[in-house]
Every structure is written in C-alpha cells, then in structure tokens.
Amino acid sequence: MAKLLYIKANPKSDQSSRTFIISEHFIKVYKEFHPNDQIITLDLYKEGIHFLSQEDINDIFAPKTEASKHHPILKYAYQFLEADKYVFAAPMWNLGIPAILKAYIDYITVSGITFKYTEQGAVGLLRGKKAVHIMATGGEYKTPPFSDFEMANRYLKTILGFMGVEDFQTITAQRLDIVGEDVEKIISNALKEAEEIAKRF
C-alpha cells in the first residue's frame, strides 16, 4: 500500500478553484485505480502554515531526536518523508507559487530529514518517490518569451529534485484568462490528462 500526500495551496473552494477542479478529479480517478492506497489531504490554509520565525529556524537546524517527529514544524518534514507520492494542487500567482506553499516548502526542506550534507555537497533523501504538480494559469507560459517568466512549476520541480524526487510530472490548464479562449475546452483537456496520469501514478 502506497501513501499519497495531497497538498492543496489555494484558499478557494474546490468548486471555485480551477486548479482544484482538476486536482479533485485526479484524486477521484486515483482512488478508483489504487483502492488500497492511503491518501492524506493537507490543506495548507486550514493547517495555518506561517512563515518561519527565528525560533523555528533554530529548531530546524538543531540536532534531530525522536521528539522532533512531534515538533509543530518538523512534523511536516517527517510526514513528507513518509509519503511515497505527492500531488501538489497549486495555481500560478504572479509567475510563482502561492506564498503559503513556499512557506510549507521551508517546513519540509530540512537537513537530516529530506536531504543531507556530505563531503560532495547536498544529497536528497527522497529517492524513488514521485510527484505531480497540477496548476492553472491565466496566461500561456509554454513558449518564449513567456516561458522564461514561469517560475512556479520550475521552482517546484527544482526544489523537489534537490530533495531527491526525480519522477516529476505537470498537469497545466493555461490561457484561462486570455480573451476569446474556450475555457471549458482547456479545462476539459486538462481533466483528461489528469485522468490518464492518475491511472498510472
């Protein structure tokens, strides 16, 4: 039985968020094809994720003990470590990821838990795990010059790669706010892509 961590980074409801419309469909299909897997939903806004304080930073860099697994910040890093698969439902906001997702990433990118330092430098500890990022965008960022502006999916792929996650896929619904676009068709195509990836994820 695999453990999937479903991370939601949008204050909108499942019905009003275009990202969540796609991600919820992904999860629905995933459940159908992986009925024995455990799915843990982590809504970052409901969790009350905040920016790290000086005290938090001190705790993160302190030696890890058995009690660290129950620390209010470090518990998220251990939860991330224990999962086998990750689904990130996070829209693009102003070319990047929502700030709350960046704050969460600061919670989980912890030396001694999700990566470690060696004589050769940093080494990720999440080898063999896989992730998918589901993202809706108002504009189009697949081709130049706008592809250079895209710093949401690229960042997420990079930081997860730093932690050892090499199997990374992306499902995007782009051009949703461009005048004249068929939004229903764009979302429909994204739902179909999500369905196919969910079956084999």
Swiss-Prot record:
User: One MF term from GO for this chain?
Assistant: electron transfer activity
Q: What class of enzyme is it?
A: oxidoreductase
Q: Which Pfam families match?
A: Flavodoxin_2
Q: Which EC number(s) are documented for this chain?
A: 1.6.5.-, 1.7.1.17
- Enumerate the catalysed reactions: 2 a quinone + NADH + H(+) = 2 a 1,4-benzosemiquinone + NAD(+); N,N-dimethyl-1,4-phenylenediamine + anthranilate + 2 NAD(+) = 2-(4-dimethylaminophenyl)diazenylbenzoate + 2 NADH + 2 H(+)
Any S-S bridges, and between which cysteines? Answer: none
Cofactor binding mode and count = Binds 1 FMN per subunit.
What cofactor requirement does the entry state?
A: FMN
List residues traversing the bilayer: none
- Keywords from the named record: Flavoprotein, FMN, NAD, Oxidoreductase
Positions contributing to FMN binding: 92-95
Q: Which InterPro entries match?
A: Flavodoxin_fold, Flavoprotein-like_sf, FMN-dep_NADH:Q_OxRdtase_AzoR1, NADH:quinone_OxRdtase_FMN_depd
Q: How does it assemble?
A: Homodimer.
What job does this protein perform?
Answer: Quinone reductase that provides resistance to thiol-specific stress caused by electrophilic quinones.
Q: Which family does it belong to?
A: Belongs to the azoreductase type 1 family.
Q: What is this protein called?
A: FMN-dependent NADH:quinone oxidoreductase
Organism, as annotated: Caldicellulosiruptor saccharolyticus (strain ATCC 43494 / DSM 8903 / Tp8T 6331)
Gene name for this UniProt entry: azoR
